[in-house]
Amino acid sequence: MQPSVRFPWKTEYTVGNESIDEQHRTLLELAGLLHMAVAAGQGYKIIQSAFAALVKYTEEHFSAEERFWTDARSGAVEKHKRLHRQITEELLALRFEGPYGVVFCTPNELTNWVEHRLIAHFIEEDQGVYRSLTQGAKRKRTSA
């Protein structure tokens, strides 16, 4: 997959775990594909396919991330799971049944979700949890 032109990866999004960072890149790429489809006025099947791919990958990523935090014995995992559910619900709300059929979000609504929920989550939550895990591991090594 090509890097997203609409939502390019920036070094400030880096969590510090290559696997999680790669998954975050993929989320941005999928969001970029959906944005292009919606902005170009593509047909229902193309937009629905792009939307379904983003939802599926978001859910898979959140599950993988939660397993990682659980395996690392992060005390923040329950709070993180709740945030993941909220973000997923907000993503799902970008597609809804209107009186005349299925309605998808506007490009601006999608951009808002990506920038204010998804990317903000990378920076504010994921980086913080990973930082606390690595600092905790360093403290354990120095006290041993």
Q: Whereabouts are the PLM-identified features?
A:
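Small-residue-biased structural context
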Residues: 1-144
